[in-house]
Amino acid sequence: MDVKNCWYREVCPKCPNQCGPTCLRYIEMLNLVQQSNIPESKWVPLKLRPGVDRDAFLELQDIKENIKSWVAKGNNLYIYSDNFGNGKTSWAIKLMLAYFNEVWAGNGFRRRGMFFSVPEFLDRSRELMNNRDEEFVKLRQDIIDCDLVIWDDITSTELTNFNHSILLNFIDARILANKANIFTGNVDYEGMAKNLGGRLSSRVWNNSKVVEFKDQDKRGVYNG
């Protein structure tokens, strides 16, 4: 990521003429994002239009404005919609970036937030049985202690027993440790129970604030 795309370019008085890659704020924030596993294409948050989801956006904005205490309390959030492409993942990442903005100062090299596409996470976990990926092993080791984890698209498919065991172990451990999680999916509780099973769906749904989006697919029509 080039410094010209810095997260603070619209509010920092040094941007663009006096800013450079040695800026401490930029370096700390970049390190947090690089360690988070957020896809680089999503490092800069979209400006989202609420449409019919105004009330849902206001709920999420309230969490965003209090994100540091929200994470410290070990809260959980499930953002879902029957429709695709209406901002669920974008909002989850927006909240994580807001948290990074609150904790960057003096953070050093500590990993504070992690993003996982659940289907990819499960595929890579299964591949570990035959091919040890040291980078992914390290990511998995940090899951339990990390402040905030995004579990994106958690309800995408019915879990096998193997995949169910993996997810349940990690999510159960985080909830018991009072660690914050953000889940996204495309099903309500009934669909979640079908895909995740009763035990895991109970952990996710009953321990989370549930926010539903109803707008249609808006990919390509966001303002920014």
Residue spans of the language-model regions?
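A short, basic N-terminal segment
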Residues: 1-66, 210-211, 215, 219-224
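Short glycine-rich substrate-engagement loop in P-loop NTPases that contacts/grips substrate
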Residues: 54-61, 80-82, 86, 99-145, ...
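Conserved catalytic network of the ASCE P-loop NTPase/AAA+ motor domain
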Residues: 70-71, 106-108, 141-144, 172-177, ...
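Walker A/P-loop nucleotide-binding motif
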Residues: 71-93
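Active-site signature of alpha/beta-hydrolase-fold catalytic machinery across serine-
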Residues: 94, 98
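Loop/turn-to-beta-strand initiation segments
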Residues: 112, 145-148, 177-183
